[in-house]
Regions:
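Acetyl-CoA-dependent GNAT
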Residues: 3-68, 74-106, 114-119, 123, ...
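Short gly/ser/thr-rich secondary-structure transition/capping motifs
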Residues: 19, 170-171
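Conserved glycine-rich acetyl-CoA-binding loop
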Residues: 104-118, 154-162, 166-167
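Conserved GNAT acetyl-CoA-binding A-motif
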Residues: 124-135, 143-152
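C-terminal "cap" of GNAT-fold acetyltransferases
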Residues: 147-150, 154-161, 167, 173-192
Length: 192
């Protein structure tokens, strides 16, 4: 797991202004409110999405089976399992916030962000639905059948905005100066 955390730190630090160390992801792994999914490349041919832990903090063995997807890897790229990107969800009672999502820079623009987001959101929605079915009354099940995913993105991040719209997110508001002076956040939602 340490190797994976090192890769997450590397990907985070090449994508975000605020630099972090191992402790950043280690603490998330311990927190019950966070869910982390990674997009892996295996042998330059197959990619798969894997949830790093279940609610007990143990690695989730049930969601890591290879899922074949068409990839855009060249034959000369690394032929070993490595992390291409990750997504961090933060669960609340009413919704799930996409806390952070990043793809390693050299793999951006190839559709991996879309695969990571759609696969992980689908799996998380399925897990939440199963939990609701086990824990709620019949009335509560019908009242809360929708999963809401929320995210915020810098309005200047055109590539990310395009991806989020493509996978069904809708703009619901703007937070002025959220990232600093003249750096506004677009708040987006997707119901699953």
């Amino acid at each position: 797991m340490e190797n994976i955390i090192d890769e997450l730190v590397k990907i985070h630090n090449e994508n975000f202004k605020n630099k972090v160390g191992d402790k950043y992801f280690s603490e998330m792994m311990l927190g019950e409110q966070y869910e982390i999914y990674c997009l892996f490349n295996f042998m330059g041919e197959n990619i798969f999405v894997k949830k790093l832990k279940d609610k007990s903090g143990k690695e989730d063995k049930n969601f890591g089976k290879k899922q074949k997807e068409k990839t855009n890897f060249g034959k000369n790229e690394e032929n070993e399992k490595n992390v291409l990107g990750y997504i961090v969800f933060y669960g609340t009672i009413e919704s799930t916030d996409i806390f952070e999502v990043a793809i390693e820079k050299k793999y951006q623009g190839r559709g991996f962000g879309e695969i990571l987001m759609t696969k992980s959101m689908g799996k998380l929605s399925e897990d939440r639905k199963n939990l609701k079915e086990n824990d709620l009354s019949e009335k509560e099940k019908t009242d809360s059948s929708e999963n809401k995913f929320l995210l915020e993105v810098n309005e200047k991040n055109v590539k990310a905005l395009k991806l989020y719209k493509k996978i069904g997110f809708e703009k619901i508001s703007i937070r002025k100066n959220y990232y600093g002076k003249d750096e506004n956040a677009v708040i987006m939602i997707k119901c699953y």
